[in-house]
């Protein structure tokens, strides 16, 4: 339920639009035009025809200069029109002598924006010159500078952020439309007795003359005017707009402008502060870089992999950028190898499910975590890359149940005999597709098999797959056609997806693109009668 303060704030006249709600499970991404309440929303998405929709073609890696598109939002395209005055959206503490500390609201002249994620700027308040992260600033008086503007995030991520604990009814954000170029979407947190907390989406269309509207009866010159209008009155929306959705501090792709291109760093620049875990091939630590920046450091036992091969693979890993992948920041390539990544507060998904707050999660949260992992793997799929070791132990969890994929690509480099034998004690047989375990044929489709096993880890809160069976028995039984039965508390429709992932023929397994779509819309399209108390 929404907080009392916000309920009072939007009561009275602001409730005028509450009678215009949509049916419990609209298939459209958007609520209807608030002045056109036909109620004709009955279609359920056809997941069998998912690939008939237009999708972006795969983008292969194209050499050292390749940086794929992602949700690390920079504004390099904004400055093309001669805009040089920018405003800080967040506080930033300098990490090296080359960059500037600044406060939210501070203004800058941009001197040089050719360095990609780091721009050279001069502060108008202090006169100091240095580098600033480009995704921490926006042009003064632009829509990008507004608290409520979230840019290029998808519908599902908008819902995740709006439904975070502590947000009230009427919390809102505006984002780029996923379906209509040049249009925007307004996403609002709502509440009613039938559905509880949920999010409604309204498309903001653009007039040929340049104005904006949700309904043609109310047109505005700017998005800012539209927002102010709906702050003052619901006017057919589910409720008045109350407060902008809180924004998390953006993720940086590099430790600093210095490590952008030269990201082999000296071991002495790292301080290992707290051991977070032990693995078969090393340890994971929480630490700091340069005494300023919190990081996670994976230390590998000497002999685990060739430093030369690791450095070559790390060149590719560094270029993979997506908000559902743990960002690789830097490496120490001499043994013992150190891998420096972003820090994730809740640790591995496996530990989180078994011993952390994950023990108390219900099915909707577990399915959403699966959808996040599928989104990250769909990106890896588009990039023509392979993970090779996808399981809950290699997924990391942050605040607000954010999940990110870690250790992608590293399994290929391990030189330990107990691992490379594939049936050895250290090899994750229970997660590995039979063609990969028996013949070494690792593909994105063997990752899909592993994802099906990971789904069982989620719904069983970290139980080891194939309970009661050892590795040899699993390999033999799977080859004979055995597949795990539906775990307790798991809906049959979710088990059906697992079984699809475990098809004998790799090409018959679904794509991660499909799995992401299926899981993101799972409770709308597959389990419309689900009640929150159904899964403990």
Curated annotation (Swiss-Prot):
Residues forming the catalytic site: 389 (proton acceptor)
Covalent lipidation (N-myristoyl glycine), chain numbering: 2
Residues with a covalently attached lipid (S-palmitoyl cysteine): 3, 6
One GO BP annotation of this record: positive regulation of phosphatidylinositol 3-kinase/protein kinase B signal transduction
Coiled-coil zones: none
Annotated ranges, domain SH3: 81-142
Domain SH2: 148-245
Name of the protein in its database record: Proto-oncogene tyrosine-protein kinase Yrk
